[in-house]
Amino acid sequence: MVRSTAGILVTALSNHEQVVLSHTDFHAPFAVQLQGHPLAAWVLRKLGWQLSFEGLPARQGVLIMYPHTSNWDFVVLLFMKWATGIQASFWAKDSLFNIPLLGRWLRYLGGVPVRRTTSQGMVGDAVALFEQAKQDDRYFWVALAPEGTRKKIPGWRSGFYRTTCGAQVPLGLVKLDYRLKTIRITDFIRLSGDEAADFERLSDVYHGVSGKNPQNASPICLLGADVPRAETVK
């Protein structure tokens, strides 16, 4: 196990966060320790951000980042990625990878081509990638914003949920709080497949977390009944 020497700042948790952490499914010390970049950690500190990260609980998993309310989120999270050493892939429409230069650039950044003709196809492709990574005992994490947009919508898109359930991997909850200027990657849970119970847990963990534009934060619930559910994943 290689421990990080990036100088990640682990701050004291509030009383509410201590209660929430007591209900998570994975606890430090985590199995996967990463090597971050000290310069990126220094930049975050100089910008006033406090970062808490103690590793990942498994070699495969899904990270969701909430709330996504501003284009600035990308900049902050990019420095977070460099500071922690987290290498995470992201989903992109498969046709984009057929464009010569763009496709190569997307793969360099960690893009994974998925079919978006149906949500079942996208989730099925993602689950298959996780299954292959498990067979190969290969590191593979996917990161995404569950809303899929920085604008307020009635709920979260179901792709992350059905992928995590279908692949049976840990779900990491990244809390991006502009009010406190904190980034916490300390909560990892197992989804049960019971949407009501799982989203109640998600609401508890993200309670009080404020985005850059709080009015744009989408409620923590799945979008309407027209969105395919977790049990459609085979």
PLM regions with names:
Residues 9-13, 34, 46, 56, ...:
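Extended interaction regions within the primary functional domain
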Residues 26-29, 45, 49-208, 221-226:
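Soluble catalytic domains of membrane acyltransferases
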Residues 208-234:
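Charged phosphate-binding loop/patch that engages nucleotide di/tri-phosphates or the phosphate backbone
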Residues 7-49:
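Extreme N-terminal tail/first-helix region
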Residues 15, 71, 98, 213-216:
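Detector for Asparagine
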